[in-house]
Amino acid sequence: MSQTEVVRRALIREARPEDDAAIGELLVEAFISQYAKKMPEVIYTDERKRALRDVASKRAVASVLVAEVDGEVAGTVALFPPGAPDSQAWMPNAADLRHLATAVRYHGQGLSRPLLDATEALARKWAVDAVALHVRKGNAGVARMYMQRGYARAPEGDLVLPTVSLEAYLLRLVD
């Protein structure tokens, strides 16, 4: 299936409880396989895998979207509203974009584009000032993808945690 065909056939919709297991496995597979290739020093603990698989908790506080292709969950993203528990947005009235991933078999086929389009449209519907996100330090390809969409580096939102350093990016929706 061509990239254009995959994107054309993708249905972007709100995740449902019956999607939770598929989303959780997709996140674990996508993050581990991609980081294992691009950043071999990254190690995912069992605790991190459990957190990625806990989609029900995310749906309770955030809008979780999926890209469905031929009845299969092929991609996902979560958008946390301002002030939501677990939000990592560092500025007021900003939504927090997290967990953008596509199934490994769909990598490089453009599925992130419609997922991000839908997420950014939802943020505008919420009337937030910006969409905030974090990228693992050193993940230049992912950072470049966001910058090509208009996200700008925002060092004031960087997070340095015991197990990871994250660089902040911001898409301003209002001037």
Language-model regions, residue ranges each:
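Solvent-exposed, flexible loop/coil residues
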Residues: E47-R48, G110, T163
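Short acidic N-proximal helix/loop "leader" segments that mark the beginning
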Residues: M1-V6
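Acetyl-CoA-dependent GNAT
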Residues: A10, E14-D20, G24-V104, L116-A118, ...
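Conserved glycine-rich acetyl-CoA-binding loop
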Residues: H99-D117, R124-W126, K137-R144, Q148-R149
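C-terminal "cap" of GNAT-fold acetyltransferases
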Residues: R16, E29, N93-A95, D129-R149, ...
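A generic structural signal for short
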Residues: I43, H107-G108, A130-V131
